């Protein structure tokens, strides 16, 4: 149930854990903390509490900043977190509390499972039942060297590849406000990235009606905006030996693991070729100033949500032996799932055939669903 005063576990699946953070319980003062770790991990936390003001009011706030490159290749993180709490004792019978918490973040992902031999051939060959031929010089997998600028080995991540910094096409992602920005790093591009911000806001009211009757009411809003990225369309890809899937070769004929070729994709999408080839497929496209058709793009799979609710509970102590509790739990929610264009990868538009309402395809631009 999040930050609420309700102590009922149902209908929360698995029950409820509720951590009470009372601003009035903290003395005046603050602190600053820094943490460091492997993979360029750096986290800074600053906190300040006002303590009790005029014997009836208190505020508390915490801000966190976290960055890192990641131990596995290009699994970087870029995140903030915040907490704000306020408490006001209006009189002996009425107390109000306001809480807000959230953590906007982005991070590079490592989603695709690889054969053990792609990480450590020697260890794979030592595993009982593993076919050592798979990691021989002519075998199916490589755990050393590189292809297309992506190194193989234990920290290999198939979800990224280098890209020329001369490509300055913007990316679109929405996280409480439209954002059309440069990619995370000018020298590489993540195929899979997660970005999300889910703020929670609670307004709590505690009313003492009498010595044996108490009413608590919580108004809350739970948001959510973000998603995850991936490819859409045809993406030039090379095998572990650097052989590109083109007019007479499919990349998965060769050894693994496989590597995306973003620079070839940008060249295809921004070039003047009537037909380009990806994995032996001929892809016809239009081209010209402001009219370059992309054959492959990056997409966002978005999740946007809003939940509003009221939780109210009345406690009535009839006697030491009998205590009654009445309450309501009401909420309404709206959730949107869709795909949108994240990066046109050098082109001006993409023709999407996923919508049955457009038999000849629908032209979509940056940020379009």
Write out the residue ranges for each language-model feature.
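N-terminal periplasmic accessory domains that precede
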Residues: 9-33, 44-50
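Outer-membrane beta-barrel pore domains and translocons
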Residues: 2, 20, 33-39, 62-66, ...
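Face-selective signature of the C-terminal outer-membrane beta-barrel domain
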Residues: 197-227, 233, 238-369
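Surface-exposed loop/interface segments of Gram-negative outer-membrane beta-barrel transport/assembly proteins
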Residues: 104-184, 263-293, 355-369
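Outer-membrane beta-barrel proteins
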Residues: 35-43, 66-91, 105-111, 121-122, 173-206, ...
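Short loop/turn motifs that connect adjacent beta-strands in outer-membrane beta-barrel proteins
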Residues: 8, 24-29, 53-56, 92-93, ...
